[in-house]
């Protein structure tokens, strides 16, 4: 009998004893349940890529309830690329984690195991409703163009579909409770434990030296989730534009859809261009530089009012308030924009402590304007769409409507025929307790002491013009962390950066790129905290740079020097910690 077959046939009661026997055979030490791993790095016989296909992962090796996991495919992939794009040879493993509920879908996952391993692992988060496996050969969000991918650096990289297979993102999977729990976070632990089981088998080591998580949007929420719930598993996390408290966020997204679904309230692309250009005319120079980027956001939001704003000396409000064409905004459109800009009260409290949706910086965003940028189509979809919201929702409508529609119909109301645009966000009536319950499942813990105390480090980043996941939500989360843990303690293990002009994952104004993984590695592994960082624009004005300012600071032009160089800017508006 082969070692793999013998291992797979072990009953649970003999697992610990069998692992001690495996130590004598392979010099590998495991710990039951896959959550604690020992420090021994003894010589051992690793399994080959093809041998992994025969490995079965027992349920008791996974830290949350499953019926175990299997490897469904393995593939030896040759080295490719050159320079910073080089990726060495690796073993690509596909697997499935089986549910307790036989009607629930599997969690499908992939794992890339490089031949030249750096003894570190990276998990990638997903996006939207998940439903497909992120590429394990990809890079961290907003990575520098010349930054090697984690796999290229030698990381073992893994990711999953979070427990359902639906890349179209309807949200229908949430009618199954186990699938819902997986999406809200449980799949992350199950994927991590299953992947590390295979890492140990392939490399014949007890544990990786360091473990990192990286994601944006839903992946950013997932990054916060793992360090809140299982901090012992992780050393560093990248959480960019995180869609944390998904239940509250989708209510805000629905409010946006409802505002623009009102009669004649939705502004087309040309009208959005009028609004954006008026905001630039009023606010661009507030940071000292007329560079097409509104950096002094707080001052802009204080002084800019579309109802009275001018563009080239002409009011952008249509004469008399009626819609007279694409050169102005009607009163109905101005009212919808103001409704989206302003907070929305909840006449109930969520488990996160939230009593309102905080609104969006809609006045200063490229909401999908006439623009030759190759990113404009996706920016349009993620902002206000190319058609007004209506029921039933279509893919041409704003992404907020698409996400919130599926969440309301399937997850909250459990009625596929329910018109989501009739849902009362402020007062859900009979659905209030359901909304509160769903919020309780999410990443809403502001006390990250366990993660901080073990030396974990967190990088947060958000764009000031995000219309999909409101910037104000991340500001709120960070402020609650400070209230809970204390400002200095938070600063000892985390950094939060705001990027002026950046939208959601993509931007036509300022699309940031920086070597965030290297910064995180240096902080975690060498104790060198990020300082004086520079971020590069890869779309708006290709190659221009700005200082990456720590919240609440923003880049202010010094008054002289190259307007496209970070050296000509200083981070202004910092709090009492001083400018960083």
Q: Predicted regions: what is each one?
A:
Residues 1-20:
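N-terminal secretory signal peptides that target proteins for export/translocation
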Residues 215-225:
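Glycine-rich nucleophile elbow surrounding the catalytic serine of serine-hydrolase chemistry
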Residues 460-462:
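Short beta-strand/loop motif that positions the catalytic acidic residue
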Residues 22-37:
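Bacterial N-terminal signal peptides
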Residues 42-120, 133-138, 143-145, 276, ...:
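Catalytic-loop region of hydrolases
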């Amino acid at each position: 009998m082969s070692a793999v077959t013998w291992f797979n046939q072990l009953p649970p009661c003999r697992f610990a004893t069998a692992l001690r026997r495996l130590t004598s055979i392979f010099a590998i030490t495991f710990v039951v349940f896959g959550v604690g791993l020992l420090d021994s790095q003894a010589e051992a016989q690793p399994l080959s890529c093809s041998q992994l296909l025969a490995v079965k992962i027992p349920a008791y090796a996974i830290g949350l309830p499953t019926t175990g996991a299997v490897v469904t495919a393995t593939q030896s992939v040759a080295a490719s690329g050159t320079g910073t794009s080089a990726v060495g040879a690796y073993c690509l493993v596909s697997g499935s984690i089986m549910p307790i509920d036989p009607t629930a879908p599997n969690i499908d996952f992939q794992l890339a195991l490089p031949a030249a391993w750096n003894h570190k692992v990276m998990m990638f988060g997903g996006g939207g409703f998940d439903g497909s496996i992120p590429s394990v050969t990809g890079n961290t969000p907003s990575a520098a163009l010349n930054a090697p991918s984690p796999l290229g650096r030698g990381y073992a990289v893994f990711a999953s579909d979070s427990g359902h297979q639906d890349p179209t993102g309807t949200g229908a999977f949430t009618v199954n409770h186990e699938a819902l729990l997986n999406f809200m976070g449980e799949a992350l632990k199950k994927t991590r434990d299953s992947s590390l089981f295979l890492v140990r088998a392939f490399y014949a080591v007890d544990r990786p030296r360091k473990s990192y998580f990286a994601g944006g949007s839903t992946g950013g929420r997932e990054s916060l989730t793992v360090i809140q719930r299982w901090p012992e598993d992780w050393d560093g996390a990248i959480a960019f534009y995180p869609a944390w408290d998904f239940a509250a966020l989708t209510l805000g997204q629905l409010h946006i859809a409802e505002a623009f679904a009102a009669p004649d309230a939705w502004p087309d692309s040309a009208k959005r261009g009028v609004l954006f250009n008026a905001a630039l005319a009023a606010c661009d120079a507030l940071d000292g530089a007329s560079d097409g980027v509104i950096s002094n956001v707080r001052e802009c939001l204080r002084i800019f009012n579309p109802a009275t704003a001018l563009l080239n000396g002409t009011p952008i409000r249509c004469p008399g308030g009626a819609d007279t064409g694409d050169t102005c905004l009607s009163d109905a459109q101005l009212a919808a924009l103001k409704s989206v800009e302003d907070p929305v009260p909840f006449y109930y409290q969520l488990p996160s402590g939230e009593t309102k949706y905080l609104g969006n910086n809609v006045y200063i965003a490229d909401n999908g304007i006439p623009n030759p940028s190759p990113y404009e189509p996706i920016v349009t979809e993620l902002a206000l769409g190319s058609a007004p919201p209506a029921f039933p929702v279509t893919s041409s409508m704003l992404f907020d409507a698409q996400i919130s529609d599926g969440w309301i119909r399937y997850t909250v109301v459990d009625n596929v025929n329910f018109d989501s645009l009739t849902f009362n966000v402020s007062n859900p009536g009979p659905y209030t307790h359901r909304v509160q319950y769903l919020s309780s499942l999410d990443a809403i813990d502001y006390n990250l002491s366990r993660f901080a105390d073990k030396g974990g480090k967190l990088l947060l980043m958000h764009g000031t013009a995000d219309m999909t996941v409101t910037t104000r939500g991340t500001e709120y989360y960070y402020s609650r962390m400070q209230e809970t843990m204390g400002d200095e303690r938070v600063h000892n293990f985390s950094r939060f950066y705001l990027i002026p002009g950046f939208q959601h994952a993509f931007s036509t104004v300022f699309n940031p790129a920086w070597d965030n993984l290297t910064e995180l590695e240096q902080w975690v592994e060498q104790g060198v905290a990020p300082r004086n960082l520079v971020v590069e624009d890869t779309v708006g004005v290709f190659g221009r740079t700005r200082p990456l300012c720590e919240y609440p600071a923003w880049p202010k032009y010094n008054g002289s020097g190259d307007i496209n160089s970070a050296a000509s800017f200083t981070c202004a508006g910092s709090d009492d910690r001083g400018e960083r």
